[in-house]
A protein has these predicted regions:
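Glycine/proline-enriched, intrinsically flexible loops and inter-domain linkers
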Residues: 1-163
Length: 163
């Protein structure tokens, strides 16, 4: 178990570990295959060949609201976020030089509201960066809602084969 920005996040699930056992020590860093590689490989194969459930609750979450919410996010994201209601867009956010600021998922809630999910470590930095780019968007409000929402993600290659 790893604690990251106050969130407990498992690195892997060891099949031999029992609920009442003391926590395992973090493995030694390695440039080769770590000792827990087989556990992660098994988890990967389940997600690829069947269905996996990933808890993304620790990821940063923001609400972007207002009449100009979509134009504002269109300016910051390099992918089109003006999609039908309920759709999720994967995008990067780039600065004025065209270099990377953030990787995010943007869900259109309605014409005046979007939710953005990005890496845990971006929570403080990206909020400040977005606030610094509000000029000209008077109706846009930003709200950090990380602690208000849980995100569970179903992962499966089988899902894509149905299209």
């Amino acid at each position: 178990m790893l604690v990251f920005r106050g969130w407990e996040r498992p690195l892997y699930f060891a099949p031999h570990h029992q609920r009442d056992d003391p926590p395992e020590k973090l493995p030694k860093p390695s440039f080769g295959r770590p000792e827990f590689f087989e556990y992660i490989e098994d988890e990967y194969l389940v997600c690829r060949e069947a269905v996996g459930l990933i808890d993304m609750s620790s990821f940063s979450k923001f609400l972007i609201k207002g009449e100009e919410a979509i134009p504002y996010m269109q300016k910051l994201c390099c992918n089109n976020v003006d999609v039908p209601k309920g759709y999720v867009t994967s995008s990067m956010m780039l600065n004025e030089s065209g270099t990377y600021e953030n990787d995010c998922l943007v869900m259109k809630r309605n014409e005046k509201s979007l939710m953005m999910v990005c890496p845990t470590q971006q929570q403080t930095r990206i909020m400040e960066w977005m606030e610094n780019h509000l000029e000209g968007f008077k109706s846009v409000s930003l709200q950090d809602v990380t602690s208000m929402y849980t995100i569970l993600t179903l992962v499966s290659e089988m899902w894509f084969s149905s299209f």
